[in-house]
């Protein structure tokens, strides 16, 4: 079952660093959010393959939103 990567803070997607098919390690940044004038990386909770990125640059995401899926 895929694992969700969720936003832990409300913010604007500043940069998408991974795309479907990319292999990532635990702690690798997948998306960078901008919130309160700070850049906050959303990291992979474990090693795996990105199967979907659900957020686009410039989009606002809310705390708890799923921004990517890992397999």
Task: Cite the ranges covered by each PLM segment.
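Short hydrophobic beta/alpha edge segments that flank linear recognition/processing sites
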Residues: 25-40, 62-71
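Surface-exposed, flexible loop/turn segments at secondary-structure boundaries
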Residues: 21, 38, 58
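Short beta-strand-turn/beta-hairpin segments enriched in glycine/proline and small hydrophobics
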Residues: 1-12, 32-45
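Short, flexible segments with low predicted structural confidence
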Residues: 6, 20-21
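PDZ-domain C-terminal substructure recognizer with occasional recognition of PDZ-binding tails
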Residues: 48, 53, 58-67
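Short histidine-centered loop motifs in beta-beta connectors
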Residues: 15-19, 52-55
């Amino acid at each position: 079952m895929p694992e969700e990567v969720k936003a832990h803070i409300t913010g604007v997607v500043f940069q998408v660093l991974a795309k479907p098919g990319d292999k990532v390690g635990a702690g690798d940044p997948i998306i960078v959010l901008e919130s309160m004038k700070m850049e906050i990386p959303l990291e992979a909770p474990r090693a795996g393959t990105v199967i979907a990125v659900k957020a686009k640059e410039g989009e606002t995401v809310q705390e708890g939103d799923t921004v990517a899926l890992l397999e």
